[in-house]
Amino acid sequence: MGFKTGDFPPVDVDTFLDKPLFERTKALALHWVQFGFGSPKMIPTTYVLKLVFLYLLAGTALITWTSGVGPFWDVAGWWNEPVVYQKLVLWTVLLEAIGLAGSWGPIAGKFKPMTGGVLFWARPGTIRLRPWKAVPGTGGDTRTVFDVVIYLGFLASLLLAIVLPGVPSESLSAVLPDNTSGLVAPWLMIAPVVLLVLCGLRDKTIFLASRGEQYLPAMVFFGVLPFVDMIVAAKLLICAVWIGAGVSKFGRHFTNVIPPMISNSPCVPSKWLKRAHYRDFPRDIRPSRFATFMAHVGGTTVEIITPLVLLFSTNYWLTLAGVVLMVVFHLFITSTFPLAVPLEWNLLFGYLAVFLFLGFPNQDGFGIADMSSPVLTVAIIAALAFFPALGNLRPDLVSFLPSMRQYAGNWASALWTFTPGAEEKLNTISPRPSRNQVDQLQALGYPAAVAEITMQQTIAWRSMHSQGRGLFSVLAARLDDLDRRTVREAEFACNSLIGFNFGEGHLHGLDLIEAVQKRVGFAPGEFVVCWVESQAIHSKVQHYQLIDAALGVIERGHWTVADAVNEQPWLPNGPIPLTVTWRAPQPAGETAPGQPVAP
């Protein structure tokens, strides 16, 4: 891998696309094992520069300058200042909400332009996705001037809270009498909380992009709780995120996440170490025992045990060890450059571990028992546990982000398929700030075949995860022309249509397909999607839908997760067993070329 030259798959560009789909998938999956996406070093370098100059330097300079805590380079002077903590959270929310943090740039499928977010959400006429149809005043799927106004108002309210100096707080002075920087004025939290909720009720994309499931509770704590309660509540919040993520890794999915993530890391140059995460490369690229150890000892165990230690420890050295472990944990994730690129989030959580548990240790009056009311403690714990519990029991009702299933591998997912030339119709959607990814790559100077092979690497990546084997199985069993179709990873395709995705299949489900169909008008069979819901924690199956954009849902069914994870990504034994629970009536003899066919 060079600085400007990537590791492109070693295939014949002129003939590769003529091969059967699963032959292509196998070649690209095997290439992924050793090279990941094969991105040139320039791309991760771009992300590092964004982290250093925009997030860290610009952010801390603005925050320290407006808070009166000394120059930004004097980290020892401000790292444990409460107002800095508050403003750094708000700064992170601001960048997320603009689209300059997670799901940014080429790793997330944004090539030209590299930003989604604000380009979509500050523009009337773009697609929006309401979370609940029953909420009055949220009808439709088109962004209005009102939507743009409340979104821009949300951004402005965050910026205002960041730039205004802190105000004195009696509850803070009672604990830290020498503090002079104060806290963010509680009334400044009213507007961002209200506007984020309004934005979310009108368009779930903005709420999820702003990481509302984590930052909205924090902003509520900033606005209504006295200082000690605020710190303890923040500890409960971060531990809920960690533990929820750890619990979500139980099961068969997460082990499949680690190998392709390590393979894509520019910080793991050793090919043998990457191959060590697979059973018997190139014959068997299911996860190895080493990958299982990394997943469930380095991941699941750390995310559950360490937060509990931090939450209850009153020993400095034990707390220090826990903090160091969580900082290393988040730095490791950052170094792998996951496809959703939540880099700012990981750096923030590393800082929060230091600030909350070393800056305000339990033994100094900031433990759970030090909250002003046990009723308040129980209420906060119950509120923080509600959506993770509901989302794991009923994943169809709750996004995987409020369910705290980050990195779990248990995600709602989809593959989109188009008949030859049909994908180009997506480019007729207007307004739409970006074109299809293959067109973005060609606009950067890549030949059409190279652009297409690059995008097919993303479906090979999907095939290396548990859902991929099931999705490909449904498509192979139901589409007799699959080899001729253009197949897309829905997470990437979604990014070009609504400006954001974070591995969240609920953003590219039936609602988005219906919105696209209303604008494009695909013929039956032209645009067929296989979409699957996350696995419920008490279930052994995943439920899928086969969707024809012109006809709606045409089949529902499920597959057993064990069958999916036991197969190779390229399905050498054919589709895994599928159980059909419903199929739309289909008049005899009326199957059009390229339309789904009954088994």
Task: List each model region and its residues.
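Alpha-helical membrane-anchoring segments
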Residues: M1-P599
